[in-house]
Regions:
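Bacterial N-terminal signal peptides
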Residues: 8-20
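Mature exported/compartmentalized surface modules and terminal targeting/interaction regions
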Residues: 2, 19-23
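Bacterial N-terminal signal peptides that target proteins for export
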Residues: 1-9
């Protein structure tokens, strides 16, 4: 059993080092497509929970990951690309990589939005210093959920499933990357 855990952790470390490099660039040819997907995700989340409007109006900035793909069998990984807005203007692109270990199996895609309460938190994200286990703090988008949501250390996280199914009782973290436009 110890050997399996060691291998799982080693795999998680390797994936954690390699996956962020896959989404490291802001590709101007794909920029319009990424922005369109992000705007579609925002519209879908606002339809699902109109109370999200307050976060869009009052946050300093936010990042929208329209499609994060996640797959797992004991060791899990997820990766997605997003679009970053600061003070209402598109600032650049982002990537998210997640690694988890535990009882989990399946595959799914979902959308995720991170709202930054203030400039300090937004700057941490842009500098690559924002890393946390958001799955515990994330709010599932459904009617009225955002009304009771709040910032945790300057960040509010909302997720909405789009495709697939997964059984997940794991622990892990997220690492974010930012590329200015």
């Amino acid at each position: 059993m110890k050997r399996k855990i060691v291998w799982a952790l080693a795999l998680a470390l390797v994936l954690g080092a390699v996956l962020p490099l896959l989404g490291a660039g802001w590709d101007p040819n794909k920029e319009k497509e990424e922005i369109a997907k992000a705007k579609e995700s925002v519209a879908a989340m606002k339809r699902a929970d109109p109370a999200l409007k307050t976060f869009f109006e009052k946050s300093y900035g936010y990042v929208v990951f329209a499609d994060i793909g996640k797959g797992a069998f004991i060791v899990g990984g997820a990766h997605g690309k997003g679009v970053v807005w600061e003070q209402g203007k598109i600032l650049g692109g982002a990537s998210v990589t997640k690694i988890s270990v535990g009882a989990q199996v399946g595959g799914m895609t979902y959308s995720e939005i991170l709202f930054f309460k203030d400039k300090v938190t937004m700057d941490k994200f842009k500098e690559g210093n924002l890393e946390f286990a958001a799955t515990a703090a994330a709010v599932m988008v459904k009617n009225g959920a955002a009304a009771d949501a709040s910032y945790d250390n300057g960040v509010a996280v909302f997720v909405m499933g789009t495709k697939g199914a997964m059984v997940d009782a794991s622990v892990g973290g997220q690492k974010f990357g930012f590329v200015a436009k």
